Design a protein with these regions (language model features):
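Secreted, disulfide-rich extracellular signaling modules
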Residues: 1-197
């Protein structure tokens, strides 16, 4: 997020719900649009809650002062996941990666991705008062490991002379695939006021 209003240390709670279908671009969504009432939330789908403060006290000052650091609310989707067809995956990232290997063409653009792999998420405030973040981007990061060949340098000495040789070695590598929100990604806000007050 790019900033906030209120108390950055106020405890808040949100839940991320998996959508059953994407929100279409050619439709107008007003602030009273409720994805739950309109049937957009997948029954039995992923629902992950997170308690947070806008100022993350777990981030050290060196990291926070780095010009590339962006304040964020991080929700891990690392629990076992079952897709609409009933297939079980070790976590949501495994689901996304296996969908890529099954049908790479579903990753060619945002439209194919949201209509065939990840229809989206609905983030609902579940509790807390006193702060509001100015959300500027939503992003899905898939962390994964794979085996790959890397070039390593090996230094030896022959007759007091250094000899540098390169060799290919099979290693386990860690990477991240990021799926950031773009202009095709709809970010809508549902506002409901306390009608009793």
């Amino acid at each position: 997020y790019s900033g906030y209003y209120g108390d950055s240390l106020a405890t808040m709670k949100m839940t991320a719900y998996e959508l059953d279908r994407p929100m279409e671009e050619d439709k107008v969504y007003y602030s009273n649009f409720n994805p739950e009432k309109e049937g957009y939330i997948r029954r039995g789908g992923l629902a992950k809650s997170k308690v947070y403060t806008l100022y993350d006290v777990n981030v050290d000052d060196d990291t926070r002062s780095n010009s590339s650091y962006m304040e964020n609310i991080h929700i891990k989707l690392d629990a076992p996941y079952r897709d609409k067809a009933g297939k079980q995956y070790s976590n949501y990232g495994s689901y996304v990666m296996q969908k890529y290997y099954e049908k790479p063409e579903n990753f060619k653009d945002a439209y194919a991705f949201i209509h065939n792999v990840v229809p989206g998420f609905y983030f609902k405030n579940q509790g807390g008062l006193g702060s509001m973040g100015y959300i500027t981007i939503s992003q899905l990061n898939v962390y994964f490991k794979y085996k790959g060949w890397v070039t390593e340098n090996d230094t030896t000495y022959v007759n007091d002379k250094m000899v540098l040789t390169e060799k290919q070695v099979l290693r386990t590598l860690a990477r991240v695939a990021s799926f950031a929100g773009t202009e095709e990604v709809l970010q809508t806000t549902n506002i409901s006021n306390d009608k009793d007050g």
